Amino acid sequence: EETRTDKQNRLMWPLLKDLSDQVVWHGEKLTREEWKDLITVLVNQTQDQEQKSAPGINGGRVYFGVRTSKSSKRYMVDVIEAIYWFGTDRGVKFSEASSKRIAWAQEWRASRG
């Protein structure tokens, strides 16, 4: 499958910024990069894809987010839609820039059936 373009990679960052600005996750504000890790782990888990993890140094389990530079276009659409779903569920007011990216992802998916 075709690898995502730089433009597609840039599409997700305004959405991640909206999450970072508006969502407090278990009492903590997260960075855009931390949200990217959480969202990509979610996407992999919901698609039953292999999710890289390792035992934590002090116990527990650490899941590694996906580096999207080698991701497919379809995967990037899945990430954008997951951000939108999660944000909407948490009452995030998406910016105009984010709304345009969400519309692009929905149009892309609709054109692929």
Which residues are covered by each model-predicted region?
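Acidic (Asp/Glu-rich) sequence patches and key acidic residues
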Residues: 1-113
